[in-house]
Amino acid sequence: MGRAPCCDKMAVKKGPWSTEEDAVLKSYIEKHGTGNNWISLPQRIGIKRCGKSCRLRWLNYLRPNLKHGGFTDEEDYIICSLYITIGSRWSIIASQLPGRTDNDIKNYWNTRLKKKLLSKQGKAFHQQLNVKFERGTTSSSSSQNQIQIFHDENTKSNQTLYNQVVDPSMRAFAMEEQSMIKNQILEPFSWEPNKVLFDVDYDAAASSYHHHASPSLNSMSSTSSIGTNNSSLQMSHYTVNHNDHDQPDMFFMDGFENFQAELFDEIANNNTVENGFDGTEILINNNYLDHDISSFIDYPLYDNE
């Protein structure tokens, strides 16, 4: 059951107050006061308004000690500080600002102050992003320059050491041998950019190869199987004799960038003793690998030309 209405809503006037109504209400209250009864006040002064409307009009607009006009910077600071502390409790905030009503403060916050703060915060945020971006770009450029300088110096030192230690005749022989092996390996096949060449045995030269189509790493020879769940590595396998370890075991593999990650996942998901690529037994569990994984993950022998 709700509260009883203070007056007949059909007999009262609604909408903005006129200048004459403001003058009548203000003059009567200044002379006689409210009498602590806002419900009967409209009848006493002879205006067709609701008692609640008269009370709000007096408190928010007609009181002599009210401040009208824009808010000062000090008032903005007080409003923001209290809003952060107690939220939108406008009557308490108004008690700290003499001459300001809770309704004025609420309207000012929703229409102007909040938008102004958001605009300043957005500008400061973008400025902070620009500063961080400039610092990051400078730091990245400096890091890249340092890496390039270190790489150049390391390359020069390695070349100098190689020239001092290796005999010139041996260098020529090594280059010639490397060229011959390269021609023997690449001549029978057409090079595809998305495939990477691996050579498990760099010292042995290949004489002939037999092609065996293999949809995944699992279909390689039984002596070089690592897991039973890996079916995403598509490749073609080339071998001479799996039982002859003197011959090289070479294969092309698609998607090399995912190979190491998938291989480590395969190792982490199994807890068995398996055979490595070279036929030796390796112990695999979730935390321990007895055989160094880098011994059978080789980098490309030659660059794509």
From Swiss-Prot:
Kindly list the GO molecular function terms attached to this UniProt entry: DNA binding; DNA-binding transcription factor activity
Q: Which Pfam families match?
A: Myb_DNA-binding (PF00249)
Write out the entry's keywords from A to Z: Activator, Developmental protein, DNA-binding, Nucleus, Repeat, Repressor, Transcription, Transcription regulation
Gene3D superfamilies listed in its UniProt record: Homeodomain-like
Location in the cell reads:
Nucleus
- DNA-binding region per Swiss-Prot/TrEMBL record: 38-62, 90-113
Q: What is the superkingdom listed in this entry's lineage? A: Eukaryota
SUPFAM superfamilies from the UniProt entry: Homeodomain-like
**Where in this chain does the record put each HTH myb-type domain?**
9-66, 67-117
Q: What is this protein's tissue specificity according to the annotation?
A: Expressed in roots, leaves, internodes, shoot tips and flowers.
Give start-end of the signal peptide. Answer: none
Q: Which PROSITE patterns match?
A: HTH_MYB
InterPro entries the UniProt entry points to: Homeodomain-like_sf (IPR009057), Myb_dom (IPR017930), SANT/Myb (IPR001005)
Q: Would you kindly state one Gene Ontology biological process term found in this protein's UniProt entry?
A: plant-type cell wall organization
SMART domains in the record, alphabetically? SANT
Is Repressor one of the keywords?
A: yes
Q: Does the keyword Kinase apply?
A: no
Quote the cellular component terms of the Gene Ontology held in the record: nucleus
Record function comment:
Transcription factor that functions as a regulator of genes affecting cell wall organization and remodeling. Activates genes related to the primary cell wall and represses genes related to the secondary cell wall and expansins. Required for the regulation of longitudinal cell growth in stems, leaves, petioles, roots, flowers and siliques.
Q: Which PANTHER family match?
A: OS09G0431300 PROTEIN (PTHR48000), TRANSCRIPTION FACTOR MYB87 (PTHR48000:SF75)
Q: What is this protein called?
A: Transcription factor MYB87
Organism source for this protein?
Answer: Arabidopsis thaliana
